[in-house]
Design a protein with these regions (language model features):
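His/Asp/Glu-enriched short active-site or ligand-binding loop at hydrolase and phosphoryl-transfer sites
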Residues: 72-86
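Active-site neighborhood of phospho(di)ester-bond hydrolases with catalytic His/Asp-centered motifs
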Residues: 31-32, 54-55, 76-78, 100-103
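Mid-to-C-terminal alpha-helical segments outside catalytic/metal-binding sites
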Residues: 116-140
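Divalent metal-binding pocket/active-site signature
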Residues: 1-71, 108
Length: 140
Protein backbone atom coordinates (compact mmCIF):
# COMPACT_ATOMS: atom_id res chain seq x y z
CA UNK A 1 0.00 0.00 0.00
CA UNK A 2 2.83 2.40 0.86
CA UNK A 3 4.45 2.00 -2.59
CA UNK A 4 1.08 2.51 -4.24
CA UNK A 5 0.51 5.75 -2.33
CA UNK A 6 3.96 7.06 -3.23
CA UNK A 7 3.30 6.32 -6.90
CA UNK A 8 -0.15 7.85 -6.73
CA UNK A 9 1.09 11.02 -5.03
CA UNK A 10 4.11 11.56 -7.28
CA UNK A 11 2.63 10.61 -10.65
CA UNK A 12 0.76 13.91 -11.25
CA UNK A 13 3.97 15.84 -10.63
CA UNK A 14 5.86 13.76 -13.17
CA UNK A 15 3.28 14.71 -15.76
CA UNK A 16 3.38 18.35 -14.74
CA UNK A 17 7.11 18.67 -15.36
CA UNK A 18 6.38 18.77 -19.10
CA UNK A 19 3.92 21.59 -18.53
CA UNK A 20 6.38 23.40 -16.26
CA UNK A 21 9.14 23.11 -18.86
CA UNK A 22 6.82 24.63 -21.46
CA UNK A 23 5.68 27.40 -19.11
CA UNK A 24 9.25 28.28 -18.20
CA UNK A 25 9.72 29.45 -21.80
CA UNK A 26 6.49 31.48 -21.87
CA UNK A 27 5.40 34.65 -20.15
CA UNK A 28 1.94 33.57 -19.01
CA UNK A 29 -0.22 33.90 -15.92
CA UNK A 30 -0.50 30.56 -14.13
CA UNK A 31 -3.25 29.89 -11.60
CA UNK A 32 -2.57 26.86 -9.40
CA UNK A 33 -4.69 24.95 -6.96
CA UNK A 34 -2.09 23.58 -4.57
CA UNK A 35 -4.23 21.78 -1.99
CA UNK A 36 -2.17 19.22 -0.05
CA UNK A 37 0.79 19.76 -2.38
CA UNK A 38 1.73 23.34 -1.55
CA UNK A 39 5.39 22.86 -0.70
CA UNK A 40 6.15 20.47 -3.56
CA UNK A 41 4.32 22.62 -6.09
CA UNK A 42 6.01 25.80 -4.84
CA UNK A 43 9.44 24.18 -5.13
CA UNK A 44 8.66 23.01 -8.66
CA UNK A 45 7.51 26.49 -9.71
CA UNK A 46 10.72 28.00 -8.35
CA UNK A 47 12.91 25.27 -9.86
CA UNK A 48 11.45 25.88 -13.30
CA UNK A 49 11.52 29.67 -12.92
CA UNK A 50 7.77 30.06 -13.37
CA UNK A 51 6.67 33.64 -12.80
CA UNK A 52 3.24 35.30 -12.64
CA UNK A 53 1.69 32.62 -10.45
CA UNK A 54 -1.63 32.90 -8.62
CA UNK A 55 -2.19 30.54 -5.71
CA UNK A 56 -5.94 29.91 -5.97
CA UNK A 57 -7.78 29.52 -2.63
CA UNK A 58 -4.53 28.80 -0.76
CA UNK A 59 -5.09 26.58 2.28
CA UNK A 60 -1.55 25.43 2.97
CA UNK A 61 0.86 25.97 5.83
CA UNK A 62 1.27 29.49 7.15
CA UNK A 63 5.05 28.98 7.21
CA UNK A 64 5.15 28.72 3.40
CA UNK A 65 3.40 32.05 2.77
CA UNK A 66 6.55 34.21 3.24
CA UNK A 67 8.40 32.10 0.66
CA UNK A 68 5.54 32.39 -1.82
CA UNK A 69 5.43 36.15 -1.20
CA UNK A 70 9.21 36.43 -1.64
CA UNK A 71 8.77 35.18 -5.22
CA UNK A 72 6.09 37.77 -5.92
CA UNK A 73 3.36 35.20 -6.40
CA UNK A 74 -0.25 36.29 -5.93
CA UNK A 75 -3.05 34.77 -3.89
CA UNK A 76 -6.69 34.73 -4.96
CA UNK A 77 -9.13 34.77 -2.09
CA UNK A 78 -12.88 34.38 -1.84
CA UNK A 79 -15.57 35.17 0.68
CA UNK A 80 -15.55 31.67 2.14
CA UNK A 81 -11.90 32.16 3.17
CA UNK A 82 -12.91 35.26 5.15
CA UNK A 83 -15.36 33.18 7.19
CA UNK A 84 -13.01 30.51 8.55
CA UNK A 85 -10.28 30.85 11.18
CA UNK A 86 -7.68 29.23 8.92
CA UNK A 87 -8.66 31.45 5.98
CA UNK A 88 -8.46 34.59 8.12
CA UNK A 89 -4.99 33.60 9.39
CA UNK A 90 -3.82 33.05 5.81
CA UNK A 91 -5.23 36.37 4.59
CA UNK A 92 -3.56 38.25 7.48
CA UNK A 93 -0.16 37.07 6.25
CA UNK A 94 -0.59 38.04 2.60
CA UNK A 95 0.64 41.51 1.62
CA UNK A 96 -2.26 43.56 0.25
CA UNK A 97 -0.42 44.13 -3.04
CA UNK A 98 -0.49 40.37 -3.76
CA UNK A 99 -4.21 39.76 -3.20
CA UNK A 100 -6.66 39.06 -6.01
CA UNK A 101 -10.30 38.07 -5.62
CA UNK A 102 -12.19 35.12 -7.03
CA UNK A 103 -15.58 33.55 -6.62
CA UNK A 104 -14.76 29.90 -7.24
CA UNK A 105 -18.28 29.66 -8.62
CA UNK A 106 -20.20 27.43 -8.90
CA UNK A 107 -18.38 25.32 -6.28
CA UNK A 108 -18.39 27.95 -3.57
CA UNK A 109 -22.01 28.77 -2.79
CA UNK A 110 -20.93 31.99 -1.10
CA UNK A 111 -19.27 33.91 -3.89
CA UNK A 112 -19.63 37.64 -3.42
CA UNK A 113 -16.55 39.60 -4.42
CA UNK A 114 -17.86 42.78 -2.81
CA UNK A 115 -18.35 40.94 0.50
CA UNK A 116 -14.83 39.54 0.23
CA UNK A 117 -13.41 43.04 -0.19
CA UNK A 118 -15.46 44.35 2.72
CA UNK A 119 -14.41 41.45 4.93
CA UNK A 120 -10.69 42.07 4.37
CA UNK A 121 -10.91 45.87 4.26
CA UNK A 122 -9.57 46.19 0.73
CA UNK A 123 -11.12 48.34 -1.98
CA UNK A 124 -11.83 47.57 -5.61
CA UNK A 125 -9.08 49.94 -6.73
CA UNK A 126 -6.45 47.95 -4.83
CA UNK A 127 -7.55 44.71 -6.52
CA UNK A 128 -7.63 46.50 -9.87
CA UNK A 129 -4.07 47.76 -9.30
CA UNK A 130 -2.86 44.28 -8.31
CA UNK A 131 -4.45 42.67 -11.35
CA UNK A 132 -3.14 45.44 -13.64
CA UNK A 133 0.39 44.85 -12.32
CA UNK A 134 0.08 41.14 -13.04
CA UNK A 135 -1.24 41.76 -16.55
CA UNK A 136 1.51 44.28 -17.29
CA UNK A 137 4.11 41.66 -16.30
CA UNK A 138 3.05 39.42 -19.19
CA UNK A 139 2.91 42.29 -21.68
CA UNK A 140 6.62 43.03 -21.35
Amino acid sequence: LKDYLINFLTRPFLLDTNVLQLLSKKNKIVSVHSRRAEKVLFEMLVTYGIKNVIFHWYSGPLSLIPKIVEHGYYFSINEKMTKTNSGIEIIKRIPRNLILTETDAPFNKVCSISNTLTDIGLGENAIYDNFSRLISAIRR
